[in-house]
Curated annotation (Swiss-Prot):
<keyword id="KW-0964">Secreted</keyword>
<dbReference type="InterPro" id="IPR000010">
    <property type="entry name" value="Cystatin_dom"/>
</dbReference>
<feature type="disulfide bond">
    <location>
        <begin position="115"/>
        <end position="135"/>
    </location>
</feature>
<dbReference type="GO" id="GO:0005634">
    <property type="term" value="C:nucleus"/>
</dbReference>
<feature type="disulfide bond">
    <location>
        <begin position="94"/>
        <end position="102"/>
    </location>
</feature>
<keyword id="KW-1015">Disulfide bond</keyword>
<feature type="signal peptide">
    <location>
        <begin position="1"/>
        <end position="28"/>
    </location>
</feature>
<dbReference type="Pfam" id="PF00031">
    <property type="entry name" value="Cystatin"/>
</dbReference>
<dbReference type="GO" id="GO:0030521">
    <property type="term" value="P:androgen receptor signaling pathway"/>
</dbReference>
<dbReference type="GO" id="GO:0036126">
    <property type="term" value="C:sperm flagellum"/>
</dbReference>
<keyword id="KW-0325">Glycoprotein</keyword>
<dbReference type="GO" id="GO:0050829">
    <property type="term" value="P:defense response to Gram-negative bacterium"/>
</dbReference>
<keyword id="KW-0732">Signal</keyword>
<dbReference type="GO" id="GO:0031640">
    <property type="term" value="P:killing of cells of another organism"/>
</dbReference>
<dbReference type="InterPro" id="IPR042930">
    <property type="entry name" value="CST11"/>
</dbReference>
<dbReference type="GO" id="GO:0005737">
    <property type="term" value="C:cytoplasm"/>
</dbReference>
<keyword id="KW-0646">Protease inhibitor</keyword>
Length: 139
């Protein structure tokens, strides 16, 4: 009998701790919503430009890459915006020192990658930061 009541007490204590921890997390990050959004949204365009520029700055490749296809964009609204972006990017004919719109690389230098970016964004004050980046070769 005592063992049964001890198990019940431990279970109630575990539930109480879980509820307190959950309420603390809710207060810490006010989660409002997450939704799929269009690339035509103005803040999304700015975020995609930022992601492309940052990728090219940090890449060790001699050539710039550009977004070829947008696979998915999710917007998470909390105290700020967070975009979760999945894109296909392809190597261009422009070296890193060139900034004009360039053709896609063909032949031996052809390279296509799929990238996932998680981006912290406050677009109305032009603040962006890549929180996570994962790119893999797809060709």
């Amino acid at each position: 009998m005592a063992a049964g009541s001890w198990k019940a007490t431990r279970l109630l204590l575990a539930i109480l701790v879980a509820l307190v921890a959950f309420s603390y997390q809710v207060k810490r990050k006010t989660f409002i919503r997450i939704e799929e959004v269009s690339a035509l949204e103005s803040s999304v365009k700015e975020t995609l430009e930022y992601v492309t520029d940052e990728y090219n700055k940090k890449s060790e490749d001699l050539y710039n890459f550009r977004i070829l296809r947008i696979l998915k964009i999710m917007k998470q609204v909390t105290g700020h915006l967070e975009y979760h972006i999945t894109v296909e990017m392809q190597r261009t004919t422009c070296l890193k020192t060139e900034t004009s719109l360039c053709d896609i690389q063909k032949g031996e230098l052809h390279k296509k990658i799929q990238c996932y970016f998680s981006v912290y964004a406050i677009p109305w004050v032009e603040v962006f930061k890549i929180l996570k980046k994962n790119c893999t070769d797809i060709s």
